[in-house]
């Protein structure tokens, strides 16, 4: 591997402050690490959640970002699966292929580097980023808000070199998460009725997954009616706003669907909505999947009777996809027009306008903003 690289990055110096575009130093990759030139990255609510200071695992200063795509610049010692020039997507859930999680077909939650990743450092306990003489932390094992980043070789997957990186970067998180929540976690069946709470990027991806699975009714639920048209483009058969009803939304859905939905999905991260989503499920077989990440310290509640009478409450991370093996297949599905990705991108901005991308997201004006270096 070559030496230190100086490049642009968006540094989060402290919680609650805008990101700052800085020149940083990126050290060469150590053993089993890869240095990647990021070509495009998108902004996700998880980045904003950590930046806000609400994330108990959040530490500063840090380089955020976990939806990106790029090209391998150099590889560290012992790296066999990548070479300079490979087209890649960094993965916030790795796949080592060896831990008991990777060996179990029921989960995608590889734990090999979980502890160090949570602390914002590489597996050897140190960072590859410095700025103005200070160490800057990594984020989710990816740190895509930098022109160059260093990732563990298990946190990376090689994809079709002809894929447009300013689109497929979304497969690093939101689109894959929602799509897999429907296909892998819920395992939606043909002819079923689904309810999707929250019509942001992840909610739209859930709708897309439900449609691919053959659901006959897909009900979108959001307070913001501006989101309804897009939801219908993705496959929602009807959309409702809780603000239009006096009674709780779960009661409305139970009436609309003759007893409740077969599958519901919470794509917001609000524990009150999680309860409504469960209680909107049909007695005897309804399944509710939690996709949204709730704030620290929040707890879910319902009456045990809801579960005793045959409803199931589940959660999902990254759509249940085993990352290294699945993301290249998702890219191929997109390339063969089997799944939508372009339609999620509402704004494309130069990297320097990253704070504007956060503002668009907070204002509900964007689904996904993609930043290009």
Curated annotation (Swiss-Prot):
Any single GO BP term: formaldehyde catabolic process
Entries under InterPro entries matching the protein: ADH-like_C, ADH-like_N, ADH_3, ADH_Zn_CS, GroES-like_sf, NAD(P)-bd_dom_sf
Binding residues for Zn(2+) 2: 96, 99, 102, 110
Positions of modified residues (N-acetylalanine): 1
Protein function: Class-III ADH is remarkably ineffective in oxidizing ethanol, but it readily catalyzes the oxidation of long-chain primary alcohols and the oxidation of S-(hydroxymethyl) glutathione. Also acts as a S-nitroso-glutathione reductase by catalyzing the NADH-dependent reduction of S-nitrosoglutathione, thereby regulating protein S-nitrosylation.
Subunit structure: Homodimer.
The name this protein goes by in its record: Alcohol dehydrogenase class-3
Organism: Saara hardwickii
């Amino acid at each position: 591997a070559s030496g230190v690289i100086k490049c642009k990055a968006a540094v989060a110096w402290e919680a609650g402050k805008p990101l700052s575009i800085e020149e940083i130093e990126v050290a060469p990759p150590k053993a089993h690490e890869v240095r990647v030139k990021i070509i495009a990255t998108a902004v996700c609510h998880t980045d904003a959640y950590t930046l806000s200071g609400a994330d108990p695992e959040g530490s500063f200063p840090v380089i955020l970002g976990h939806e990106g795509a790029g090209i391998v610049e150099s590889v560290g010692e012992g790296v066999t699966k990548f070479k300079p020039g490979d087209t890649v997507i960094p993965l916030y859930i790795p796949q080592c292929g060896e831990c008991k999680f990777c060996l179990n077909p029921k989960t995608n939650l590889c734990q090999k580097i979980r502890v160090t990743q949570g602390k914002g450092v590489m597996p050897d306990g140190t960072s590859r980023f410095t700025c103005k003489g200070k160490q800057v932390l990594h984020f989710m094992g990816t740190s895509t808000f930098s022109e160059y980043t260093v990732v563990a070789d298990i946190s990376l997957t090689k994809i079709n070199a002809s894929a447009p990186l300013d689109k497929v970067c979304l497969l690093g998180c939101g689109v894959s998460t929602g799509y897999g929540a429907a296909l892998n976690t819920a395992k939606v069946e043909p002819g079923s009725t689904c309810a999707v709470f929250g019509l942001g990027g992840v909610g739209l991806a859930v709708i897309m997954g439900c449609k691919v699975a053959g659901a006959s009714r897909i009900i979108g639920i959001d307070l913001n009616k501006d989101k309804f048209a897009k939801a219908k483009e993705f496959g929602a058969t009807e959309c409702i706003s809780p603000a239009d009803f006096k009674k709780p939304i779960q009661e409305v859905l139970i009436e609309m669907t003759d007893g409740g939905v077969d599958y519901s999905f919470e794509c917001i991260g609000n524990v009150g909505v999680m309860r409504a989503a469960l209680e909107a499920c049909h007695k005897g077989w309804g399944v509710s999947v939690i996709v949204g990440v709730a704030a620290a310290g929040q707890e879910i509640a319902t009456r045990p009777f809801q579960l005793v009478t045959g409803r199931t409450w589940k959660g999902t991370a990254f759509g249940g996809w085993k990352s290294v093996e699945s993301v290249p297949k998702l890219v191929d599905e997109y390339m063969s027009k089997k799944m939508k990705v372009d339609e999620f991108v509402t704004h494309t901005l130069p990297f320097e306008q990253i704070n504007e991308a956060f503002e668009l997201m907070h204002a509900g004006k964007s689904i996904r903003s993609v930043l290009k270096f």
